[in-house]
Each structure stands twice: as structure tokens, then as C-alpha cells.
Amino acid sequence: ASNGEAPDALGAMYNHLERRGNIWGLTSDVRQKFVASAGLETFDASRHEYLMWLGCAGSYDGDFQKSLRSLFSILRAHGVTFGVLARERCTGDVAKRTGNEYLFQELATANIADFQASAVRKILTAGPPCLKTLGDDYRRLGFDVEVVHSAVFVSRLAPERFSASEKHSDSSSTPEVALHDPCYLSRYAGHADEPRALLTRIGAVLREPERSGRNPFCCGAGGGLLFEEHEEGTRISQRRFEQLQATGVATIVTACPFCAIMLKGAQASANAATEVVDLMTFVDGRIRPASAGAPTAGAQGTSEQAGP
């Protein structure tokens, strides 16, 4: 897109970003309804340690909003204080990855101004692309704050907060899962161990698929491919789903809304019984509330920068 030309699907997405500030072109009332129903407070630096960045998926995707509710439940149970901006616009991740630097700069400049006006110092996000953009690309623009992904944050909660008696609250048997590593979380930010540690601590047994850890196989959404019109042939998402399904598990866990979208699409195409579940949804209910006086996760230095 750097030369002014882009496929129709990307061109439509750019238009959505310019007009509505999100990749799907949805109106802000969709986000506002979710914020209200989830009981989210507007960020106030004097009361909230973290800005919760919802992102396009968290603001507008119904399935991922269910996952965020699980995350909010975990954070509230452990005394983590967080709020959201009254208004969000996309970080510009897809514009950046597909070569539309002008649009990225426009979105980033506006977002940085909002962050600075609200005195934001720590950002918590559940989207690996947002982690990469906020923690790396924005840092290169001079906005250098702590940015942490929710999977990393929750994995570093004090070990005593994980209740052995609740590990298998939904089943009498040990759950076996395959973990799909999001590229921006594992390969670029280097966080392959934390999701695994979290799953292990709640009693899950991991069955590793082909290409995992810090050398994952992409879900097929990265680099703007989420918006590409695919030609005939096997899609990347289908190939990845087959690799995960080959582990023989009934549940595939991931920590990225766009990975979930792609894998669920492949699951539906294959008419497979294997379910795709967000990590926070999987662990919600398996972590007991923090005891009175215990330090919050934020007090343990969970924040990380994304990227090199």
C-alpha cells in the first residue's frame, strides 16, 4: 500500500480506519454498550494502575468480548485496578504491516496524544498485535511506557493464588489441550513460556503441536491476511488447525483474538468437534481470589515491552 495501491479488501479496511477508527467500520456505540455492560470505568490515573486497551477485537467482536469478561473477572478478583479510555481508535497495526505508513502515523499520533492527556503509564492488552504496536512501534515514536499482554500478566500472579482444589472444577479428569502460539506474543515478544506455565499451574496437560513455542506456525491472519480474499487451495488457517488437531486433544487454546477467529473458521470448515478457546476463558474460575493483603500482580513487575 506504500505506493498508493492496495487490494480491494485492504482498501475497504483503510477506509474503515479513516472513517470509524476500527478495522471493521463499526460505530462506536457497539463499544460503548460493551463497556457499560462489563462495568468498565473510564481510566483515571489517580485511581487506576493500568489502562486496559480493548483494541478493535475487544471493542467490536462478540466472541472476544466474552473472553475479556473472563479476564476482567480474574483481574478484579486479584485487586488489579484498571480503566478504559472513553474512546479508542485502532493502534494502526494492520496499516503499518501492510505498508500504509501515513495512516499508521495518523492513528499513532492521535492515540499517543490521548495516552499523554490521560497520564497513562502502564497498558494491559489481550491482543498480541496491539502489544507489538503499542510496545514497539509507538516506543520508536517516543512513547515509551510499560505494555504487557494479559497472558503474561496473569501467569505472574502469585503462585499461592492458584487453588489446587479448583484445578479441575469443570471436569473429573485432567484437561489435555494444545496451545497455539500467536506470532506477536511468542516469536516477536518472546513470551512462549508464560502461557504454558499458566496452563500447567491450573492442571492442564499440554500436547505440543508441530511448530510451537518461539517458532510458531502462523494462524493466517498476520500481515493483513485477515482481509485478503483467498484463492483456491488450502488456507494457512486450515493447515494450522490440522496441525493442532493432530495432537488428539479436544481443546485448542490461544491467546489472540485474531488467531481465534482464523482457527474457529477452520474448525467450522472442517466440521470438527475440537473446540477453540481463549486462554483467559479457559483459566477463569480455576484461579481463587487473592487473600486479603496479598500484593497485586502489578506490584510484582509484570509489565514488558514488546518486540526487540
Task: Indicate residue ranges for each PLM-predicted region.
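Iron-sulfur-cluster electron-transfer modules
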Residues: A1-T133, D137-G142, L157
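Local cysteine-cluster metal-coordination motifs and their immediate loop/turn environment
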Residues: G55-S59, R87-T98, T125-T133, D181-A189, ...
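Short, flexible loop segments at boundaries between secondary-structure elements
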Residues: F143-E166, R211-R214, A268-G298, E304-G307
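Redox- and metal-dependent alpha/beta enzyme cores, enriched for Fe-S-associated oxidoreductases
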Residues: P159-F162, V177-E229
